[in-house]
A protein has these predicted regions:
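Acyl-donor-binding surface of acyltransferase catalytic domains
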Residues: 1-10
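Active-site acidic-Proline motif in GNAT/NAT acetyltransferases
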Residues: 99-101, 105, 133-134
Length: 178
């Protein structure tokens, strides 16, 4: 893991911090996500609160935060892992983002490692994600972690010219999430 960074799950009570970090990610890299800062800024606070509250008890979600291990505990990145609603043996990774000041320090790799450990712990057989085709650093990270291209690139959202490459990683266990 990156020195000076710890990876943990968001607590349900941390929805304001999750909201702030998510909106920061959308503003920093608007081309990398299927949503936009404008859309999510309009969400009612109750929706943000409910999202993390549901994730904390579902057993099918793992919202992760990377934070400085020092006294400031500044949040430096996030990644959400979630069981596919139609196939409990598949975990999808989304909302991956690392703050510019923390990039190149192993934070993204640590977030992915934690998400993969969670996926293995719930007996998932496959992990899927989509990565913007122009984000070569992220693509190389996922390839180093064992992901492979899993289909043809497609628009990241309807009407977008930006393409997203689907990727997948087979896990050794072959049972469904409980």
């Amino acid at each position: 893991m990156s020195e000076g960074i710890r990876i943990r799950r968001f607590a349900s009570s941390e929805w304001p911090a999750y909201r702030a970090l998510r909106l920061r990610s959308l503003r920093d890299a608007p081309e990398a996500f299927g949503s936009s800062a404008e859309a999510e800024e309009a969400w009612d606070p109750a929706l943000w609160m409910a999202r993390l509250a549901a994730a904390s008890v579902s057993g099918r979600d793992c919202p992760l935060v990377a934070e400085s291990a020092g006294p400031d505990g500044a949040m430096r990145g996030l990644l959400w892992a979630k069981c596919d609603p139609e196939d409990a043996g598949i975990v999808k990774l989304f909302q991956m983002w690392v703050a510019p000041e923390a990039r190149g320090r192993g934070v993204a790799a640590a977030l992915v490692d934690e998400a993969l450990a969670w996926a293995a712990s719930i007996q998932a057989r496959l992990v899927q994600l989509g990565v913007v085709c122009s984000n070569e650093a992220a693509i190389q990270l996922y390839l180093r972690k064992g992901f492979r291209n899993a289909g043809a690139p497609a628009p990241i959202r309807p009407g977008s010219a930006r393409l997203e490459q689907p990727m997948a990683l087979d896990l050794p266990r072959r049972q469904d999430c409980a």
